[in-house]
A protein has these predicted regions:
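Flexible coil/turn and secondary-structure edge motifs
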Residues: 18-199
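Low-complexity, intrinsically disordered regions enriched in charged/polar residues
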Residues: 1, 10, 181-184
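Bacterial N-terminal signal peptides
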Residues: 3-15
Length: 199
C-alpha cells in the first residue's frame, strides 16, 4: 500500500512539474511579411524559442484568399508568417533582428525576383508593446542600410492560414529549385550571423 501511495505521489509531482513548466512559458506571436513566406518560415523554424511557424496571408481585402489569387497581386494580401515564440527564450526584439537580416526592407513591394505587393515588407503588431518595439527597431536598423526602410508597420488584421502544401515547405522540399537557390542561402546566412539564436 505504501509503495502504491509513493507511486501516485511521484506521478502527481511529475504532472505538477510539467504544468509548472508550461505555465512558465511566455508565448507571444509575431506576424511578419518579407517576400516569399517559404524563406521566413525556414529561418524561424531554426530559431531557438520558436514553437510554431505558420504561413499565411494578411492585410488584404479578400476573405479566405487562395494562393492563386494572392500570387496575382490582386487581393492586397501579403504573404506572411505567424511566429509563435517563448519570449523567455527569444525576445520580440531578437525576432525582428532576424527579420531585418533575412530580407531587404528597403525595396518596395519586391524581394529579389519576387515582385508585387504580396511580397511587401510589413510588420503587423499584435499590441502596443510590439508596436513600440518595432518602431525602435526600425529606427535602429535604419542606420544599417544604405537606402530608407520602407517596411509597413500596421495593426494586426485577420490572418488566413495558407494551404497545407505551403506549410513546412523548405523542410519538405529542400531540393526544389527556389528552395536551393533562394531559401537555403537565407537559412545559412542566419546560422552564420546569429549563431546564438539557432536551435
Amino acid at each position: 500500500m505504501r509503495k502504491l501511495f509513493l507511486f501516485f505521489s511521484l506521478m502527481g509531482s511529475l504532472y505538477l512539474s510539467a504544468d509548472a513548466k508550461e505555465n512558465n512559458m511566455k508565448n507571444e506571436i509575431a506576424t511578419l511579411g518579407g517576400g516569399c513566406f517559404w524563406c521566413l518560415e525556414a529561418v524561424f523554424e531554426e530559431t531557438r524559442g520558436v514553437l510554431e511557424v505558420v504561413n499565411g496571408y494578411a492585410g488584404g481585402d479578400v476573405v479566405n484568399p487562395r494562393y492563386e489569387q494572392v500570387s496575382m497581386g490582386k487581393t492586397n494580401h501579403a504573404e506572411v508568417v505567424q511566429v509563435t515564440f517563448d519570449a523567455n527564450i527569444v525576445s520580440y526584439e531578437e525576432i525582428l533582428k532576424i527579420f531585418w537580416l533575412i530580407h531587404d526592407p528597403t525595396t518596395l513591394n519586391r524581394q529579389g525576383n519576387d515582385i508585387g505587393t504580396q511580397y511587401r515588407s510589413v510588420i503587423f503588431y499584435h499590441n502596443i508593446k510590439q508596436k513600440e518595439v518595432a518602431e525602435a527597431s526600425i529606427k535602429l536598423f535604419s542606420t544599417k542600410f544604405l537606402n530608407p526602410i520602407v517596411t509597413q508597420l500596421l495593426p494586426m488584421p485577420t490572418f488566413y492560414k495558407a494551404e497545407d502544401y505551403h506549410q513546412d515547405y523548405f523542410k519538405n522540399n529542400p531540393n526544389q529549385g527556389y528552395c536551393s537557390f533562394v531559401v537555403a542561402p537565407k537559412v545559412e546566412k542566419f546560422k552564420g550571423v546569429y549563431k546564438d539564436l539557432v536551435k
